[in-house]
Amino acid sequence: QEWADVDFWGNELTLHASEHKLDNERHDVDMGNVSVPHFGVHLSRKDFDALKQRLKDNGTKYYDEPYLRFKGTKYEQETFFVKDPNENILEIKTLTANPD
């Protein structure tokens, strides 16, 4: 199969297989730099913590360890990056100051 649809926390993410790989680079942001390209998803604190525990239980290594962004503001969020089995980079984050 050359493609797959994945339930990406209530959103459809369609993945296509390709021989061509994009080069990763890092772009400067507020707290350092992030890998580009990447996919991102905002999770509730409950789902975020459950996913972190699942990754830990499975021995998954972080691409970028969890850290806080916008610390002390209403936009404060915890975020981390992982690679999927096809080397796609995923950013997972949750708001910490005002989860609603």
Specify the residue positions occupied by each region the protein language model found.
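Short connector loops at helix/strand junctions that flank enzyme active sites
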Residues: 8-10, 31-36
